[in-house]
């Protein structure tokens, strides 16, 4: 009996030691992205880039000789309590070395992950998130925004829309946006800049996420006959239904849907029906024809893996993983968070399009190595027409007047 008990104890100790040894051979990383709910489509787009980068690293020896292990958490609709639960689970319990979150909120994520020191990479695109960071930069030093804020993206949209090789029939603008900080920031910036050049905001509608019946708004739009509609809702389904209903009785109007053009579900659902629609992808790699050989190799591999062109978030979060891995390798310890964060802030990362760096707010503003890419849907796919900064016509694409404009 004693022998059996002793043997059981020895086996338990051996299993525990083996488990610890296995754990020591991996580096955990957190991926809190929406897997259910209204943001699940864009969450899947982010995950494709994250997984592609992690698979590449693991196939070539991992980071510092250790394989990366992904721990996921469903961040759903970024409710503050869910975001806090994710941070406590990933950083508090799983002790991850880094977190790759994609769109993660509009400031609640900064508060949640700022309690810890592991580098946290987000795509909030929100001035509200930056404002939280600015309340205590030393505390939130581990928070990295991978794209420009809403106002920065809206300025780029304004530049693109006012430089189309197209003569607007009038100077009437309609803006439709969501009621979150993202939608309001875009609306305010677009309206202010168009008013400066003599345009009139003929109608502005703020709506909640989940709005899919556009009949009343569109009936008013058809009476106004605006030269331009800017529609800004960072969720695929609302963009799909708006375009479908607009095209039932279109006006001679350029339709811009901003960030909403780039979730993969939008072009997958609409196909060639969306031809002529304009939008933008912040922090993008132009495709299907990339600007250089390194970028083209990446595009070709992505398309080979996922059987479609690049959606929003995939390339920039592939890059976030590679930037963190490079910093960890240079420091020599993925868990020396102070040193890894210092390396990222001081050195940035050499990506497919050049050196990318964060500013004093840890925001990756629009820059040549991480440009805003402006697209038009053509033949059911995204075709780049401008990159910014500086705003430049893309050499492998051109604007085509939408078929519904007579």
Model-derived regions, located:
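Segments of small-molecule ligand-sensing domains
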Residues: 301-314, 325-386, 406
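Immediate post-signal peptide segment of exported/extracytoplasmic ligand-binding proteins
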Residues: 21-31, 61-67, 162-171
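Beta-alpha junction/loop-to-helix N-cap segments that form part of ligand/metal-binding clefts
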Residues: 28, 41-48, 60-134, 146, ...
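Extracellular/periplasmic Venus flytrap/periplasmic-binding protein
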Residues: 81, 85, 141-249, 287-293, ...
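Extracytoplasmic ligand/sensor domains, especially the bilobed periplasmic-binding protein
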Residues: 96-204, 254-279
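Extracytoplasmic "Venus flytrap"
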Residues: 26-51, 73-80, 103, 176-185, ...
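Bacterial N-terminal signal peptides
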Residues: 8-18
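Extracellular/periplasmic periplasmic-binding protein-like sensory domains
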Residues: 246-318, 329-331, 388-405
């Amino acid at each position: 009996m004693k022998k059996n008990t002793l043997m059981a104890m020895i086996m338990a100790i051996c299993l525990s030691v083996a488990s610890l040894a296995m754990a020591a051979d991996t580096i955990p990383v957190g991926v809190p992205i929406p897997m259910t709910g209204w943001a699940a489509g864009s969450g899947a787009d982010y995950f494709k880039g994250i997984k592609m980068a992690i698979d590449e690293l693991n196939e070539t020896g991992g980071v510092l000789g250790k394989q990366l292990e992904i721990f996921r958490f469903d961040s759903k609709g970024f409710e503050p309590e869910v975001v806090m639960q994710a941070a406590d689970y990933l950083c508090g319990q799983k002790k991850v070395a880094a977190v790759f979150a994609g769109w993660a909120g509009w400031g609640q994520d900064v508060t949640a992950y700022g309690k810890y020191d592991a580098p946290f990479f987000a795509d909030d695109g929100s001035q509200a998130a930056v404002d939280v960071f600015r309340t205590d930069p030393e505390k939130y030093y581990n928070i990295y925004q991978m794209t420009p804020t809403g106002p920065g993206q809206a300025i780029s949209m304004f530049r693109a829309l006012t430089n189309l090789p197209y003569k607007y029939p009038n100077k009437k603008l309609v803006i439709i946006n969501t009621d979150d900080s993202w939608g309001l920031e875009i609306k305010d910036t677009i309206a202010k800049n168009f008013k400066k050049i003599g345009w009139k905001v003929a109608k502005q509608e703020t709506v909640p996420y989940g709005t899919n019946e556009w009949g009343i708004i569109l009936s008013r739009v058809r009476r106004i006959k605006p030269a331009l509609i800017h529609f800004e809702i960072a969720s695929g389904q609302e963009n799909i239904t708006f375009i479908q209903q607009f095209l039932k009785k279109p006006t001679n109007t350029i339709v811009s849907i901003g960030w909403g053009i780039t979730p993969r579900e939008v072009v997958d659902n609409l196909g060639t029906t969306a031809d002529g629609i304009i939008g933008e992808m912040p922090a993008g790699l132009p495709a299907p024809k990339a600007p250089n050989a390194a970028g083209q190799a990446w595009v070709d591999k992505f398309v080979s893996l996922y059987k479609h062109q690049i959606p929003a978030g995939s390339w920039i979060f592939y890059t976030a993983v590679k930037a963190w891995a490079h910093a960890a390798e240079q420091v020599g310890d993925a868990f020396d968070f102070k040193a890894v964060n210092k390396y990222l802030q001081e050195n940035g990362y050499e990506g497919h399009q050049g050196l990318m760096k964060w500013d004093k707010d840890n925001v990756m503003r629009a820059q040549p190595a991480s440009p805003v890419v402006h697209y038009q849907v053509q033949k059911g796919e995204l075709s780049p027409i401008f990159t910014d900064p500086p705003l430049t016509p893309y050499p492998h694409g051109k604007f085509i007047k939408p078929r519904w404009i007579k």
